[in-house]
Amino acid sequence: MLKSSKKEDSSKKNQNNKLIFTVRKLFSPIKNFFRKTKTPDNFFGVIKRLKINSQKMTLDERNILANLLELEDKTIEDIMVPRSDIAAIKLTTNLEELSESIKLEVPHTRTLIYDGTLDNVVGFIHIKDLFKALATKQNGRLKKLIRKHIIAAPSMKLLDLLAKMRRERTHIAIVVDEYGGTDGLVTIEDLIEEIVGRIDDEHDQQLDSDNFKVINNSTIISNARVEVEVLEEIIGEKLHNDYDEFDTIGGLVLTRVSSVPAIGTRIDISENIEIEVTDATPRSLKQVKIRLKNGLNGQ
């Protein structure tokens, strides 16, 4: 497990305190307003008036206001973690097995628990509950550690979801499709990030640094979920148009094959581009290596 120095911990604590102060200061007039009305339209009216009178606000405060205004039109579908990226544990797993699984596979503080298939999520556990149970030598199954989640549709507005999470006192929502199957996942952190900006933990920082790396003039390593436009800008070549039904590099690859390709598969995208699958599951692409036969910008 990674350990941070006292100096790093102090720096993080100061940053968190500054963020908390900023949010409290900014939301004070909003909180007071909601004591008088529950109308969403009036809520955004308050936000807009705050933005107009934002000359004395800091950059962080103005950014939060801008994010709040954008929240008016955003739905769960815009931010949810897709089904293929959900980390979950079977209900039949015992506590010792779960402890090892979380250490090796699941870098999050909360983990979904399902019965049979991912379409039957029964709740989630918090890692602190797990380690507390292990420390007190509790044995058995997971049921006594499971916390409740809520169910939401992809079309639900983010502000409505935030209010529902607060009412239900839970931090996780399972997004279901029209047939009741699990479509995705949204956490309270996802919603907060939409308002105050991205909140990175150590795992996020590792993923971000590996998302898109230009190794040399002819090789790029990329997360399959990086947008195609990022690659187009780097190589100076158009790879898709407005009529294509994909946005990511992984989507680009899948248009050339009939199923998710195995690790090691190489696919010619154009005369200059070959993409090799370097990480994948049976359901989705994770990472690819992009080879530029003519080098960057044909050099």
Swiss-Prot record:
Superkingdom classification of source: Bacteria
GO molecular function, one term: flavin adenine dinucleotide binding
Record flagged with keyword tRNA-binding: no
Gene Ontology terms: cellular component: plasma membrane
UniProt KW Transmembrane keyword: no
Keywords: CBS domain, Repeat
Residue ranges of domain CBS in the record: 80-142, 145-202
Classification via SMART domains: CorC_HlyC
Family membership: Belongs to the UPF0053 family. Hemolysin C subfamily.
Leftover remarks: Despite the presence of the tlyC gene, the true SFG rickettsiae are non-hemolytic.
Protein name, per record: Hemolysin C homolog
Organism: Rickettsia rickettsii (strain Sheila Smith)
